[in-house]
Structures are given as C-alpha cells and as structure tokens.
Curated annotation (Swiss-Prot):
The chain crosses the membrane at residues 10-30, 36-56, 74-96. Residues 513-575 are annotated as: Disordered. The record marks 132-133, 325-326, 402-403, 497-498 as: Cleavage. One of its GO terms (cellular component) is membrane. Signal peptide: none annotated. Residues 541-553 have a biased composition (Basic residues). This is Polyprotein P2A. It comes from Southern bean mosaic virus (isolate Bean/United States/Arkansas) (SBMV). The keyword Membrane applies. Residues 558-575 have a biased composition (Polar residues). The active site is at residues 181, 216, 284. GO terms for molecular function: serine-type endopeptidase activity; transferase activity. InterPro entries: Peptidase_S1_PA (IPR009003), Peptidase_S1_PA_chymotrypsin (IPR043504), Peptidase_S39B_luteovirus (IPR000382). Residues 135-335 form the Peptidase S39 domain.
Amino acid sequence: MYHPGRSPSFLITLANVICAAILFDIHTGGYQPGSLIPIVAWMTPFVTLLWLSASFATYLYKYVRTRLLPEEKVARVYYTAQSAPYFDPALGVMMQFAPSHGGASIEVQVNPSWISLLGGSLKINGDDASNESAVLGSFYSSVKPGDEPASLVAIKSGPQTIGFGCRTKIDGDDCLFTANHVWNNSMRPTALAKRGKQVAIEDWETPLSCDHKMLDFVVVRVPKHVWSKLGVKATQLVCPSDKDAVTCYGGSSSDNLLSGTGVCSKVDFSWKLTHSCPTAAGWSGTPIYSSRGVVGMHVGFEDIGKLNRGVNAFYVSNYLLRSQETLPPELSVIEIPFEDVETRSYEFIEVEIKGRGKAKLGKREFAWIPESGKYWADDDDDSLPPPPKVVDGKMVWSSAQETVAEPLNYQRAAGSRPLPPFLNLQATTSKKEKQPLQEECPLDLLGSRLASLESCVEKILQMKSLELLGSSQNCQTSPGPSEAPKQSFTPCYSKQESLIPLESQGILKELVKTSLSATPPPNPVTVSVEKPGPSTQSTKKSARRRNRRKSTRKPVQESPSPASPQPTKTSLRGI
C-alpha cells in the first residue's frame, strides 16, 4: 500500500521545511558568520530545484518519446440480407444476401433452428468457442465517440480488439483492471486504444492476478504518462446493489462502440454477480458501470441467452487485494480460519492469487490457505520421521532422524557432591537490623481494658449516689417529687455528670483518653439516605404507638427507699 513516508517528494519537502527554519534563524541572527550550517541550509533548496528540473525534463522526454499512432482496424467484410426468407422445396428456407463491398448477391440456406432469430437483432454469438452471450429480448445501442466513460480503454492485439478494461485504484496503486484471460492468452496484447488512438504496450508489471474461471482478473501497472497521452481517467469501484441498472460497452474498435443495458443481481457468493447486459465476442473484461461507478467486470455467460456473469470488483479490491487488516462493512464479508472451512455446509472454491497466496472463497466468508496447504496436526504418520529402534533393551538411533547418537534422557543425571567449606572464610561482624514493631491492640487486651473502665465508672457512680441519698434524707426542707419521672433515653452518665465532683471527672476523662488511644479507629461507614417509603412509614407508626403506650403508663409516686438503693449502670457510650 502507498505510504507517504516512502515518497522521495515527501522527504525532500521535509528537508526544505527544516532548511527554511534554519534560514529564518540565520536571518534573525541565530548563528555566527563562520558556521557551516547556513551553507548546508542553502544547498538543500538548490539540490531540490535541480531534482525538480530533472524530473520535469524526464517526464517531457518520455511524453515526447511516446508515439501516438492511428488505431489499426480490421477491414470487415459482411453480407446484408436483401430479401425476406422464402421456402425452397429442395433446400429449405433460403435468403438473398449482398456483400458490403459491392458485387453480386448470393443465395444462402438458413438453418431451421435460426429462423426464430431473424426477426430482431443477433441474440447468440455464432462462435462456439466464445465465452460471450447475448440476452434474448435485449438490443445493442450505438455509442458516439467521446460519449463512452472516461475510464474505459480497449485492449488490442494487432488490429483486433480482444477485450476491454478500466483505469482505477486498487490498494492505493493506479492500475488497469481487466480479465486475466484477455491479458494472458495466446493472442498477446500489443496496444491500448482510446477514441481511435493507441499506445504500444511495453513490459508492464502485473503484481496481482488470478486465472480461476470464476475469479478471472489481472491488475496491470500502466505508467501515468500513458494514461495522460490517451486521456484516460480513473474511476471508483463501488459496492453493487440488487436490481441496480448497469451498462456494458464493447465493440470492434475504441471509436466504434456499442452498449448494452441490463440489471445487476447479487448472488449467494459475494465475489460473484450476474447481469442481463448483452455482450459479444471481444467484450471480456469490460467494466460493468452503474450510476455510482464500476460495480463489476464482465468475464463470461452464466446462462446462455439469459444471464451473463461478472466479478465483483469491490469485493476483489477491498477484501482479497487489500493490505490493511480492517475490512469494509458494505458486503458483510468476514475472514475465518482455514480449519473452519470444513465445518461449513456449503462448498468453497479454491483460488490462487498471484501476489497474495491461495484462498478459499465461500458465500460471505473467505479463508487464506497456509503455505504448506495443511497444518502440522493434519500430517500423515507416513510423513513423520522414523522413530528409534529398540535392540536388546537399548534404543538404537542410527536409523532415526536425530542429531544425537544417544538418548538425551538416560537413567538419571550424575550425583553432585557438595564442596567442603572454604578455610579462609571469616565471620562477619555485621548485625541484623531489627525491624521496628508496629503498634497493635489485640482484641483480648482491648476487651479487658473496656471491662476495667466500666467497673471503675460503676463504682464511682454508686459511691456518689449513696452520698447524695444520705444528704437528701438529712435535709428537712426537701420537697418530694412533684410528678412522676419520665422515661429518658439519655445515657446514665450524661444525666449524673453534674453530680460527680470535679476531681472525679478529671480522673474519668483521663481513663477515657487512655482507653481510646489504645483502641484502633473504626472503619468508616457510608450512610445511605433512603427516601421515605412504605417500610419507613410503618416504622414511624409503630414508634408512635410505643410512645403512646409509655405515656399512658401509671406514674410512680413513691420515692426510692434509702435502704435499697438502685445502682445506676452506665456503658461506655455515656462517657
């Protein structure tokens, strides 16, 4: 495929851009006067100018040297019917014909099987060896010189036209695309003709070709000055569509062309297409034109008198001859491994493409055949090298295709003895560095600390509650409770914190700090905010019912007895 980095013009342009940057730096005073860089920078544009002049002179020389000669034509002699068919009792159906060059007319016997063909134009070619066929009910139209497509070109062998082709681009290369049996046959092509002028064919390269009957094509690299001399322009290869109106061109010379119109039809195999355009001898390789471009190339007849066959040019250029790995999606064709071909229910055709290799073509699939033709696992046992023979319990390798005289794995490897310690070795004084221990808090230690903290807090609260109860009993003016105490969900420690002296509160805070510093931090918990739903509403209702029951309970009027004080137990949450 064409790559811009490999073109000499691209490299020269890049060098001139660099030199232009250097010259700009020189103009702005970026280099010293004695430096050699400005000289090299001026030499590059000068060499580029010489190269362009030499290239233009070479092109002019080749253009002038290419000779444009008048197209050679065959002086065809034919006879024209002068009378209607008539019946002769002895000879059958007869007709009178007169020669085209003038002279006396002759009487010709008409074959009875041809009588039905006399009412219209010629339907089927008379040459039995021809691969072309007209289509019943179709007619040929004359084409004025200059009205044919600009990409169409005739292929000549002496004065005879042996086929047609078109100029197009395949994998980035400008080339001639035609049928292989036109370019490589006994009648060697000698010239390309366009609008009555022809250019002699030289030893042009054919990098890609296939001689299979169903996939008949060749790619010829024609020099650009030849295309320019003939006035042939490139065309585009497009994907064919079903029931697409198409036209084929052909004739005895490039300035005496006929055209036939028909309909293009796609078949199960994507590399093939059929059309109903009438053709004649010498039309092989002619492009099949649609309103969008070239959809295929005519190669022969499919059903004589009804359908003709062509090669899908878009499939060939974009799937078989494409150097890129990415395939276009227009035809939905995929490449499969070679071993998957046998798993398909239909038959693949095997083709060999010069310049690409062998391939298997299916309906919407194709596979490239490995160079050996099969994988190593498919080799027959006879093709494998003979194994060694066993004689008297020993393996004889003389008859085997091996490079050793003894087996690689005998009984076992020889035993190895450890080396004695070296006497000159001395002990080193280096000490092993101790790794710093990471602080950790085991679960049992944490549990014991929490238990001791709770017991300490509980004892202090019991002592303070007893002191408060004793002082309240000794007080004469202390009124009783005016109302029943309400149940509170506040922790016990928070309620009685005001009752604890300041000295005890400091001790408790120090204990809490010591316990929390030895406790590892808890994992963060992500709080998810839920939207109110049926479950949350039912939870709120049940909470309201519980609060109503608590409010309707009978309040306790009696004060706690000093003889039986109720110790208050608090948890770590209240600290």
